[in-house]
Regions:
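OB-fold single-stranded nucleic acid-binding module
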Residues: 21-24, 30-240
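Positively charged n-region of N-terminal signal peptides that target proteins for export
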Residues: 1-8
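C-terminal motif of bacterial Sec signal peptides marking the signal peptidase cleavage site
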Residues: 16-19
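Repetitive helical segments and hydrophobic/amphipathic motifs
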Residues: 11-12
Length: 240
Protein backbone atom coordinates (compact mmCIF):
# COMPACT_ATOMS: atom_id res chain seq x y z
CA UNK A 1 0.00 0.00 0.00
CA UNK A 2 2.86 2.35 0.92
CA UNK A 3 4.54 1.55 -2.41
CA UNK A 4 1.36 2.36 -4.36
CA UNK A 5 0.88 5.56 -2.38
CA UNK A 6 4.48 6.59 -3.03
CA UNK A 7 4.06 6.00 -6.76
CA UNK A 8 0.86 8.07 -6.84
CA UNK A 9 2.54 10.89 -4.94
CA UNK A 10 5.54 10.81 -7.27
CA UNK A 11 3.30 10.97 -10.33
CA UNK A 12 1.38 13.88 -8.84
CA UNK A 13 4.63 15.72 -8.12
CA UNK A 14 5.85 15.16 -11.69
CA UNK A 15 2.61 16.51 -13.11
CA UNK A 16 2.84 19.55 -10.84
CA UNK A 17 6.41 20.25 -11.95
CA UNK A 18 5.50 19.89 -15.62
CA UNK A 19 2.58 22.26 -15.16
CA UNK A 20 4.77 24.82 -13.39
CA UNK A 21 7.49 24.58 -16.02
CA UNK A 22 5.05 25.03 -18.89
CA UNK A 23 3.41 28.01 -17.23
CA UNK A 24 6.76 29.69 -16.53
CA UNK A 25 7.97 29.16 -20.07
CA UNK A 26 4.81 30.60 -21.61
CA UNK A 27 5.03 33.66 -19.40
CA UNK A 28 8.70 34.24 -20.26
CA UNK A 29 8.06 33.85 -23.98
CA UNK A 30 5.23 36.35 -23.91
CA UNK A 31 7.35 38.94 -22.08
CA UNK A 32 10.56 38.61 -24.09
CA UNK A 33 11.05 40.06 -27.59
CA UNK A 34 12.04 37.82 -30.47
CA UNK A 35 15.80 37.25 -30.63
CA UNK A 36 17.67 39.67 -32.87
CA UNK A 37 20.28 37.24 -34.10
CA UNK A 38 23.23 38.75 -35.97
CA UNK A 39 24.78 36.96 -38.94
CA UNK A 40 28.39 35.81 -38.84
CA UNK A 41 30.79 38.74 -39.07
CA UNK A 42 28.14 41.32 -38.17
CA UNK A 43 28.79 43.70 -35.28
CA UNK A 44 26.58 44.08 -32.25
CA UNK A 45 25.50 47.63 -31.50
CA UNK A 46 28.07 47.85 -28.68
CA UNK A 47 30.82 46.74 -31.06
CA UNK A 48 29.70 49.37 -33.56
CA UNK A 49 29.82 52.11 -30.90
CA UNK A 50 33.29 50.95 -29.80
CA UNK A 51 34.67 50.90 -33.36
CA UNK A 52 37.22 53.56 -34.29
CA UNK A 53 36.22 56.42 -36.55
CA UNK A 54 36.97 55.75 -40.23
CA UNK A 55 37.09 51.99 -39.62
CA UNK A 56 34.97 49.58 -41.63
CA UNK A 57 31.75 48.50 -39.95
CA UNK A 58 29.22 45.80 -40.76
CA UNK A 59 25.81 45.98 -39.09
CA UNK A 60 22.35 44.52 -39.39
CA UNK A 61 19.35 46.64 -38.50
CA UNK A 62 15.77 47.38 -39.41
CA UNK A 63 14.70 50.29 -41.58
CA UNK A 64 12.55 52.77 -39.66
CA UNK A 65 12.36 55.44 -42.39
CA UNK A 66 14.39 56.83 -45.25
CA UNK A 67 14.82 60.09 -47.10
CA UNK A 68 14.02 60.56 -50.77
CA UNK A 69 15.91 58.36 -53.22
CA UNK A 70 18.14 60.20 -55.68
CA UNK A 71 21.16 59.45 -57.88
CA UNK A 72 21.11 55.76 -56.86
CA UNK A 73 21.46 56.66 -53.17
CA UNK A 74 19.16 56.78 -50.17
CA UNK A 75 19.74 57.92 -46.59
CA UNK A 76 18.27 55.52 -44.04
CA UNK A 77 17.25 55.74 -40.39
CA UNK A 78 17.66 52.23 -38.97
CA UNK A 79 17.41 50.61 -35.56
CA UNK A 80 17.87 47.26 -33.85
CA UNK A 81 16.88 46.21 -30.33
CA UNK A 82 19.95 47.89 -28.81
CA UNK A 83 20.44 51.16 -30.67
CA UNK A 84 20.09 53.12 -33.88
CA UNK A 85 22.08 53.99 -36.99
CA UNK A 86 22.13 56.86 -39.48
CA UNK A 87 23.13 55.38 -42.83
CA UNK A 88 24.16 58.24 -45.10
CA UNK A 89 23.64 58.03 -48.87
CA UNK A 90 23.51 54.25 -49.11
CA UNK A 91 24.06 52.89 -52.61
CA UNK A 92 20.65 51.69 -53.74
CA UNK A 93 18.65 51.27 -56.93
CA UNK A 94 15.29 52.99 -57.22
CA UNK A 95 13.59 49.59 -57.31
CA UNK A 96 15.28 48.48 -54.09
CA UNK A 97 14.54 51.81 -52.40
CA UNK A 98 10.84 51.10 -52.90
CA UNK A 99 11.30 47.88 -50.89
CA UNK A 100 12.84 49.64 -47.89
CA UNK A 101 9.58 49.89 -46.00
CA UNK A 102 9.60 50.32 -42.21
CA UNK A 103 10.61 47.07 -40.51
CA UNK A 104 12.74 45.72 -43.36
CA UNK A 105 15.96 44.06 -42.14
CA UNK A 106 19.15 45.01 -44.00
CA UNK A 107 22.84 44.24 -43.71
CA UNK A 108 25.02 47.31 -44.23
CA UNK A 109 28.75 47.60 -44.86
CA UNK A 110 30.44 50.99 -44.72
CA UNK A 111 32.74 53.22 -42.71
CA UNK A 112 32.04 54.83 -39.37
CA UNK A 113 32.18 58.61 -39.57
CA UNK A 114 31.16 61.74 -37.72
CA UNK A 115 29.92 65.12 -38.88
CA UNK A 116 29.09 67.94 -36.47
CA UNK A 117 28.57 65.40 -33.70
CA UNK A 118 26.39 63.04 -35.74
CA UNK A 119 27.83 59.51 -35.89
CA UNK A 120 26.91 57.85 -39.19
CA UNK A 121 27.77 55.10 -41.61
CA UNK A 122 29.43 56.54 -44.71
CA UNK A 123 29.93 55.07 -48.21
CA UNK A 124 27.49 52.29 -47.34
CA UNK A 125 26.34 49.37 -49.43
CA UNK A 126 23.60 46.98 -48.36
CA UNK A 127 21.77 43.74 -48.94
CA UNK A 128 18.41 42.54 -47.69
CA UNK A 129 18.80 40.31 -44.64
CA UNK A 130 15.84 37.98 -44.40
CA UNK A 131 12.20 38.16 -43.44
CA UNK A 132 12.46 39.30 -39.81
CA UNK A 133 10.85 42.68 -39.14
CA UNK A 134 10.98 45.25 -36.34
CA UNK A 135 9.49 48.72 -35.99
CA UNK A 136 10.62 50.57 -32.87
CA UNK A 137 8.22 52.32 -30.53
CA UNK A 138 9.11 55.91 -29.68
CA UNK A 139 11.40 56.13 -26.65
CA UNK A 140 10.31 58.91 -24.29
CA UNK A 141 13.45 61.05 -24.05
CA UNK A 142 11.83 64.09 -22.43
CA UNK A 143 13.63 63.67 -19.11
CA UNK A 144 16.99 63.36 -20.90
CA UNK A 145 16.71 66.61 -22.85
CA UNK A 146 19.58 68.85 -21.77
CA UNK A 147 21.54 66.00 -20.15
CA UNK A 148 24.72 64.18 -21.18
CA UNK A 149 22.76 60.92 -21.39
CA UNK A 150 20.63 62.05 -24.33
CA UNK A 151 23.35 61.38 -26.91
CA UNK A 152 23.41 57.71 -25.85
CA UNK A 153 20.14 57.44 -27.76
CA UNK A 154 21.44 59.17 -30.89
CA UNK A 155 19.44 58.32 -34.04
CA UNK A 156 16.72 56.45 -32.12
CA UNK A 157 13.04 57.08 -32.73
CA UNK A 158 12.06 59.23 -29.75
CA UNK A 159 9.30 61.43 -28.37
CA UNK A 160 9.61 64.67 -26.40
CA UNK A 161 6.52 65.74 -24.50
CA UNK A 162 5.33 69.16 -23.41
CA UNK A 163 7.69 71.30 -25.51
CA UNK A 164 6.91 74.96 -26.14
CA UNK A 165 7.31 76.35 -29.65
CA UNK A 166 9.62 79.38 -29.62
CA UNK A 167 9.88 79.98 -33.37
CA UNK A 168 9.24 78.46 -36.80
CA UNK A 169 11.39 79.41 -39.80
CA UNK A 170 11.75 78.06 -43.34
CA UNK A 171 15.20 77.43 -44.77
CA UNK A 172 16.07 80.23 -47.21
CA UNK A 173 12.76 81.84 -46.18
CA UNK A 174 11.13 79.48 -48.67
CA UNK A 175 8.03 77.50 -47.66
CA UNK A 176 8.50 74.01 -49.06
CA UNK A 177 12.11 73.81 -47.87
CA UNK A 178 13.32 72.49 -44.50
CA UNK A 179 11.58 73.92 -41.44
CA UNK A 180 13.74 75.06 -38.53
CA UNK A 181 11.86 74.58 -35.28
CA UNK A 182 13.07 76.11 -32.03
CA UNK A 183 11.47 74.54 -28.97
CA UNK A 184 12.00 75.02 -25.26
CA UNK A 185 11.72 72.97 -22.11
CA UNK A 186 12.31 74.30 -18.61
CA UNK A 187 13.68 77.57 -19.97
CA UNK A 188 16.25 76.06 -22.37
CA UNK A 189 15.94 76.25 -26.17
CA UNK A 190 16.65 73.40 -28.57
CA UNK A 191 16.78 73.36 -32.38
CA UNK A 192 14.77 70.68 -34.20
CA UNK A 193 14.14 70.31 -37.93
CA UNK A 194 11.58 69.10 -40.44
CA UNK A 195 13.72 67.60 -43.23
CA UNK A 196 11.88 68.00 -46.53
CA UNK A 197 13.65 64.93 -47.95
CA UNK A 198 12.24 62.86 -45.07
CA UNK A 199 8.81 64.46 -44.64
CA UNK A 200 8.05 66.48 -47.75
CA UNK A 201 5.63 69.44 -48.03
CA UNK A 202 2.73 67.12 -48.89
CA UNK A 203 2.97 65.19 -45.61
CA UNK A 204 0.68 65.87 -42.67
CA UNK A 205 3.59 66.61 -40.34
CA UNK A 206 5.07 69.24 -42.67
CA UNK A 207 1.71 70.99 -42.93
CA UNK A 208 1.09 70.76 -39.17
CA UNK A 209 4.49 72.18 -38.23
CA UNK A 210 4.10 74.98 -40.79
CA UNK A 211 0.99 76.15 -38.94
CA UNK A 212 2.46 76.16 -35.42
CA UNK A 213 2.81 79.45 -33.58
CA UNK A 214 5.14 80.64 -30.83
CA UNK A 215 3.69 79.60 -27.50
CA UNK A 216 2.05 76.41 -28.75
CA UNK A 217 2.74 73.38 -26.54
CA UNK A 218 3.43 70.16 -28.42
CA UNK A 219 4.60 66.57 -28.21
CA UNK A 220 7.19 65.86 -30.89
CA UNK A 221 8.23 62.51 -32.39
CA UNK A 222 11.26 62.03 -34.58
CA UNK A 223 14.73 60.64 -35.06
CA UNK A 224 17.37 61.87 -32.62
CA UNK A 225 19.75 63.40 -35.15
CA UNK A 226 22.69 65.51 -34.00
CA UNK A 227 24.09 68.74 -35.44
CA UNK A 228 26.27 70.63 -32.98
CA UNK A 229 23.83 69.31 -30.39
CA UNK A 230 20.42 67.70 -30.53
CA UNK A 231 18.66 68.41 -33.83
CA UNK A 232 15.76 65.96 -33.94
CA UNK A 233 14.37 65.22 -37.40
CA UNK A 234 10.65 65.59 -36.76
CA UNK A 235 8.22 62.95 -38.06
CA UNK A 236 5.17 63.73 -35.95
CA UNK A 237 3.73 66.55 -33.85
CA UNK A 238 0.72 66.73 -31.56
CA UNK A 239 -0.55 70.10 -30.40
CA UNK A 240 -1.71 70.07 -26.78
Amino acid sequence: MRKITAIVLALALMLTLVGCTTGGSASTTAAAPAADVKSEGVMTYDEYIAAEMDSQVVIEAYVQAHQSWWDNKVTVYAQDYDGAYFIYEMACSEADAAKLVPGTKIKVTGYKGEWAGEVEIMDPTFEFAGDATYVASAFDATALLGTDDLIKHQNEFVVFKGLTIESIAFKNDAPGDDIYVTVSLNGTNYDFCVERYLTDPDTDVYKAVSELQAGDVVDVEGFLYWYEGVNTHITGVTKK
